[in-house]
Amino acid sequence: MAGVSACIKYSMFTFNFLFWLCGILILALAIWVRVSNDSQAIFGSEDVGSSSYVAVDILIAVGAIIMILGFLGCCGAIKESRCMLLLFFIGLLLILLLQVATGILGAVFKSKSDRIVNETLYENTKLLSATGESEKQFQEAIIVFQEEFKCCGLVNGAADWGNNFQHYPELCACLDKQRPCQSYNGKQVYKETCISFIKDFLAKNLIIVIGISFGLAVIEILGLVFSMVLYCQIGNK
């Protein structure tokens, strides 16, 4: 009877240890986004709703599942447990199929997702002219974004701020003369609105997510191969 290849066994262990670390990283990052002050300010208002956190909550679940699978894979490899390896294989295969399905749905409903982003941004415009405490947190987050990207307002420029425009002395102040400016209520403000910068920001991050997902899919396929080879070798001992 053939023995278990030490190379396959320890390659499987190393792979799953790295996989487990990836799970910790994803989980930690998602939790940080979920509880950070900036994300609370942007997504935490009642007007925006809790649906904005769905993607973050999914990442928390994915990170936890990857940690569990990494643990199963490590223990299965070291203990040469066919049961653990089979559970690892099934779990990893389900995650891979879910990633493929998500990618297909994302491509099919891309236009719809773009429309949802537009509607959300337009809906959030009214928060800039509101006076409540929860809206104030959102406003402060947008002010930081405006200063970084040298833009003003979300859709209609400085007019989006309504009466709040007078409450923030340096709001939208056009300090970079290389950027287009315009006069509003006796002040020179940035002419460009922030909606295009936000869309570009989301698009760039989406490309990063797609790249990470593709790399993760390759790693997952290797994990499936390693686990099945080791599973068969243990059965043939």
Swiss-Prot record:
Membrane topology designation: Multi-pass membrane protein
Please verify whether the record's keywords include Ribonucleoprotein: no
| Superkingdom of the organism of origin | Eukaryota
Kindly list the places in or outside the cell where this protein is found, as annotated in its UniProt entry.
Cell membrane
Q: InterPro entries, from UniProt?
A: Tetraspanin/Peripherin, Tetraspanin_animals, Tetraspanin_CS, Tetraspanin_EC2_sf
Q: Provide a Gene Ontology MF annotation, just one.
A: integrin binding
A single GO CC term for this protein reads: plasma membrane
Glycosylated residues: list them.
Answer: N118
What residue stretch is flagged as signal peptide? none
What sections of the protein cross the membrane?
A: 10-33, 58-72, 84-109, 206-230
Q: Please give the residue ranges for the topological domain Extracellular.
A: 34-57, 110-205
- GO BP term, pick one: negative regulation of blood coagulation
Tissue expression profile of the protein: Gastric, colon, rectal, and pancreatic carcinomas.
Q: Which loops or segments lie on the Cytoplasmic side of the membrane, by the record?
A: 1-9, 73-83, 231-237
Could you tell me the keywords of this UniProt record?
Cell membrane, Glycoprotein, Membrane, Transmembrane, Transmembrane helix
Lyase as a keyword of this entry, yes or no, is: no
Q: What family is this?
A: Belongs to the tetraspanin (TM4SF) family.
Sum up the protein's function in the record's words. Answer: Structural component of specialized membrane microdomains known as tetraspanin-enriched microdomains (TERMs), which act as platforms for receptor clustering and signaling. Participates thereby in diverse biological functions such as cell signal transduction, migration and protein trafficking. Promotes ADAM17-mediated TNF-alpha processing through recruitment of ADAM17 to tetraspanin-enriched micro-domains (TEMs). Forms a complex with RICTOR and integrin alpha3/ITGA3 to mediate mTORC2 activation and AKT1 phosphorylation leading to cell migration.
Could you describe the subunit structure of this protein? Forms homooligomers. Interacts with MEP1B. Interacts with integrin alpha3/ITGA3. Interacts with RICTOR and MTOR. Interacts with ADAM17. Interacts with ECE1.
Q: What is the protein named?
A: Tetraspanin-8
Source organism per entry reads Homo sapiens (Human)
Q: What is the lineage of its organism?
A: Eukaryota, Metazoa, Chordata, Craniata, Vertebrata
